[in-house]
Amino acid sequence: MSKTYLGVDIGGTAVKLGLVDENGAVLRRAERSVSFDGYKTPILDTVQAAIHEFLTADTPRLEGIAVSATGQIDSRRGVVAGTCGNFPGWIGVDIKGTLERAFGLPVTVANDANCMLLGEVWAGAAKGYTDVIGVTLGTGVGGGILTGGRLLEGARGLGGELGHFRLHALNGVACTCGAIGCYERYAATTALVRDAQKMGLDAPDGRTI
């Protein structure tokens, strides 16, 4: 019988859940907002509530939980090491330890853009390639780099952070990371909403656009 895993994607707007088999097929999925009350509820509390609701009585036995999370992730410890200011109260959160205690399953945690890249290499558009660059566009902008078949994480887990290379260093838009003119401030959903509203459009969020 095929092994089943729980995939959890924690983004700046929502947490997405999926039951996934060992071949990468998604058996069931769900989504819940993490910003529904302006982040007053701790993000990991929302994530745990979503998982409890998602795991019904007929859920197959799980082998483990794999978490892709926004921010600078210490993948060895499963802890959030840093953010660029998009996600309040996120730095220092022990995702791995908290979820292992709550659900009694082994948990692996990595940066969301790196997970996207590895997923594409494993079972998607980049299957069979050893040198790949991937870019994620969402609440923020993320990136992952595979070179020679190895993921480039860097000493601090920032090796693929493409959202923070600077397009307009002298007179650009201020970024939440503290720099000026980062790519994220022009390409992310938040940037599109900002620009649409400046044009007088009714655009409360990215889904509307």
Task: Go through each PLM region and give its residues.
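Short glycine-rich, Thr/Ser-proximal phosphate-binding strand/loop in the N-terminal lobe
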Residues: 2-45, 49, 60, 79-82, ...
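Short, small-residue-rich loop/turn micro-motifs
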Residues: 21, 69-73, 169
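Short coil-to-beta-strand
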Residues: 21, 63-67, 204
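Glycine-rich phosphate-binding loop and adjoining helix at the ATP-binding site
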Residues: 36, 40-48, 52, 61-65, ...
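Short glycine-rich anion-binding loops that position phosphate/pyrophosphate groups of nucleotides
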Residues: 13, 70-73, 138-140
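Glycine/GP-enriched mid-protein hinge/lid loop-to-helix segment characteristic of carbohydrate kinases
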Residues: 18-20, 28-31, 38-42, 100-102, ...
